[in-house]
A protein has these predicted regions:
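Conserved glycine-rich cofactor-binding loop
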Residues: 42, 47-50
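Rossmann-fold cofactor-recognition segment
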Residues: 85-103
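SDR active-site lid
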Residues: 196-259
């Protein structure tokens, strides 16, 4: 074995050791999650008719929270609310709204505050229904900002939290999801900056940015089935991870496990990073790729 090979092996061992130490330190330093703290918590979940948002609603219901859920389809939300009530939610209500309409975003927050008497958690999870809506940015980005601004006063009073559902595609560039990724990068930038501002102002409000990989929602599975070589992780597990991270007021959380390491080492080996990303896709020039989403 050459001296160069020995040096490379030593470097890789040190790199792996550093990654393990960083991961253990992150997990060790996280506060203990207590389920009982969420009993009676006042929670607004957006994008809650299907996928991760639906699973978030069910988990919060099992924990005895008071829920307002929102999405576009009222008939689907009605069924989700009914199940939340069966699972043990103290209260469960829905507001049918289209986040492409600025007045709807304000209305949802106002109605949730009026119905619940305030908010402890604002969980921002919705996405636009089409690539055109994503390019526009009204749904995937601007409505998040608008709802956060509207909810901040009541969250300040309750020492509450904003939970933002983001994506690994908002940390690392990837193909065939450009509108979606662009808005996730924007969310990470805005809410990451807002975290600093709130900390400097000694605010009572915490922000948790949840970085997700590929999740097995119906929406995501339908759009990626022909051209992605990746394992999708369960929506119900990702939802539980999100709730735990928000309840313990972590500034950032990662699910599944590989998203943490991908983010940690994204700039260390750019050539291999790019090859790994491209290898994850089955590209056929004759295909018309559909935007990848995870929510």
């Amino acid at each position: 074995m050459t001296a160069t090979s020995l040096q490379m092996n030593l470097f890789l061992k040190l790199l792996l050791s550093s990654a393990c130490v960083a991961f253990i330190a992150q997990r060790w330093s996280a506060p203990t999650f207590r389920k009982e703290d969420l009993k009676g918590a006042r929670v607004l979940v957006t994008g809650a008719s299907t996928g991760i948002g639906e699973q978030l609603a069910y988990h919060y219901a099992r924990l005895g929270a008071q829920l307002v859920i929102t999405a576009r389809r009222g008939n689907v939300l009605e069924k989700v609310v009914s199940k939340c009530q069966e699972l043990g939610a103290q209260r469960a209500l829905y507001v049918s709204a289209d986040m492409a309409n600025p007045s709807d975003a304000d209305l949802v927050v106002k109605q949730a505050i009026d119905e619940l008497g305030g908010l402890d958690y604002l969980v921002l999870n919705h996405i636009g229904p089409s690539p055109y809506a994503m390019w526009n940015g009204d749904v995937n980005f601007l409505s998040y900002l608008q709802m956060a601004q509207k909810a901040l006063p009541t969250l300040e009073e309750s020492k509450g939290s904003i939970i933002v559902i983001s994506s690994l595609l908002g940390k690392m560039c990837g193909p065939f999801a450009l509108p979606y990724a662009a808005t996730k990068f924007a969310l990470n930038g805005f809410f990451g900056g807002l975290q600093h501002e709130l900390a400097m102002q000694k605010s009572n409000v915490s922000i948790t940015i949840c970085v997700l990989g590929l999740i097995d929602t119906d929406n995501a599975m339908e759009k990626i089935k022909d051209y992605i070589n990746m394992t999708a992780y369960p929506a119900h597990e990702s939802a539980w991870h999100i709730i735990e991270a928000g309840a313990t007021r972590q500034p950032e959380s990662f699910y599944p496990w590989y998203t943490y390491y991908a983010t940690l080492f994204r700039d260390w080996f750019p050539y291999y990073r790019d090859k790994a990303i491209q290898y994850s896709y089955t590209y056929n020039p004759e295909m018309d790729p559909k935007p990848v989403t995870t929510n």
